[in-house]
Amino acid sequence: MGQAAWKGFVLSLFDYKTAKFVVAKSKKVGLLYRVLQLIILLYLLIWVFLIKKSYQDIDTSLQSAVVTKVKGVAYTNTTMLGERLWDVADFVIPSQGENVFFVVTNLIVTPNQRQGICAEREGIPDGECSEDDDCHAGESVVAGHGLKTGRCLRVGNSTRGTCEIFAWCPVETKSMPTDPLLKDAESFTIFIKNFIRFPKFNFSKANVLETDNKHFLKTCHFSSTNLYCPIFRLGSIVRWAGADFQDIALKGGVIGIYIEWDCDLDKAASKCNPHYYFNRLDNKHTHSISSGYNFRFARYYRDPNGVEFRDLMKAYGIRFDVIVNGKAGKFSIIPTVINIGSGLALMGAGAFFCDLVLIYLIRKSEFYRDKKFEKVRGQKEDANVEVEANEMEQERPEDEPLERVRQDEQSQELAQSGRKQNSNCQVLLEPARFGLRENAIVNVKQSQILHPVKT
């Protein structure tokens, strides 16, 4: 049994399977197949080719350069600074203009600082003390302003004080104005010039209108109908980013300016236009301890005696990050052929699904399954099968009933009876053959009778 199974397995390795086309008269399966074909065709035409434009070769390696320029002036009149006019050199950092720049909107100024000895500011845990031993000489104050001298300074009869430090004195004040210093910054304008290039297609463009009119950039402002005048009002950018200008100007913040280029180079170059998006990038929760954006800088001077002093400024403002990205597409035969081939493969998957429904799921599935799958043997294999059948016939037991032998003989007689009409010779030979068959039957009877005697 095991040898026969192994032989059958080896022979099955040399079987060849070929497709057989069966026309199934099933309206349900036929309708399902046409619906699947329609869905796949619509997916291929609408989504793949019209929406995703998968027939194009795509270039996402965008090369970009950004130049920014801020213009505007602001006037302030405070008790600490007096009357002062602020221009671009005062409130724009860095002044040369890059894709990241900062506009000052609020200041805390500590003027006339000189290096010397003074008390640390209150509210700094490492600078607080009760006695001199709490202030180790030579140690710096963590998150403070200078080095400890070893003395604890207390006011009046207070038991708590702050360490004496060597620093720029007086130290920076903690108080903050309730209104931004540069309220007029809302009307400042920002000019953003962007150059882009797609190297795969050697395509270049800028976001500024190509014109000979020298006064164009001096009179225009950006709008949805004027995309090639990239001059933005600062207050408008903050509003488009979903923020309030007075709030963000007081404590500062970070705003992203996104320039998106999505170019279809199968169309005219004039159809490749920039799209602008604005978003606030920093933590804008009002109760967060990390909200806002600020940094410090100083301006240094010397008095007539040559002693250096400075004005320390803690600047709050808006940091702008200009982020450019994009892609360009152009027709190419390679992605077109690939996507068409994928669509045809989906068609084949639809046919496979319908085959499963036809031969396994519907009511007459067994009938269709028998019609679809058929085994075909070669002539040599048919001869082998016939030989095996003859061998099995010869191995039939001797005690088989005589009636079955007679039935076989009668069937042979009926098969040969049709040949008697062919010639007279055959008619003459039939009685002799019949006599031989009778003798064979008698011999079989005798063997059956003698068999019990032998045993």
From Swiss-Prot:
InterPro entries, per database record: P2X5_purnocptor, P2X_extracellular_dom_sf, P2X_purnocptor, P2X_RECEPTOR_CS
Bias kind Polar residues: ranges: 412-422
Any one biological process term the GO annotation gives: monoatomic cation transport
Catalyzed reaction equations: Na(+)(in) = Na(+)(out); Ca(2+)(in) = Ca(2+)(out); chloride(in) = chloride(out)
Region annotation (Disordered) ranges: 384-422
Annotated domain remarks: The second transmembrane domain and the conserved Asp-355 are essential for P2RX5 subunit assembly.
Protein name: P2X purinoceptor 5
Gene name linked to the record: P2rx5
